[in-house]
Amino acid sequence: MAFPCYEDYRSAPLTIVRMLPMSDAHNVLITEFYTAFQHLDAEAMAACYTDDVVFSDPAFGELRGRDAGDMWRMLTTRAKDFSLVFDHVRSDDTTGSAHWVATYLFSATGNTVVNDIGARFVFRDGKICEHHDHFDLWRWSRQALGTKGLLLGWTPLVRNAVRAQALKGLKAFQAGR
């Protein structure tokens, strides 16, 4: 969803949110989140979250509060050959969902990844307080890690190694800020 009548795309959704019924406002919030992601604007993404947000996905596990925003800051800062599309944005007064596909160059191997993700949200006070992304980690590891991911990506050993590496990268990013 574009907001051509606004010079700054980030100003439109928050203004509109205050005038819409909650389910519509939550659809706008989800749209704002992914539009910011398309622009690699992690600050606008993090602004959609409550301070105590709970985020989870198969790569990072569960992140809380600032760690969730910092994950997006790290990923958007490091993004190479990145594109994102999203659709199926739905919500009611308390929950929402969306589907998104990110295509990017995985820097550790130079492989292109097309990650197909389902997202679920819980809202509180007009912001996202829970965000749970779901994707096939084996499919991701086959693309990102090549043969190693194809042969071993389904094993707990590789799954745990992916999570440990993701968290190590996040901690290093946070230490360098």
Identify what each model region corresponds to.
Residues 30-37, 49, 68, 72, ...:
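Hydrophobic alpha-helical core bundles mediating ligand binding, dimerization, or RNAP-core interactions
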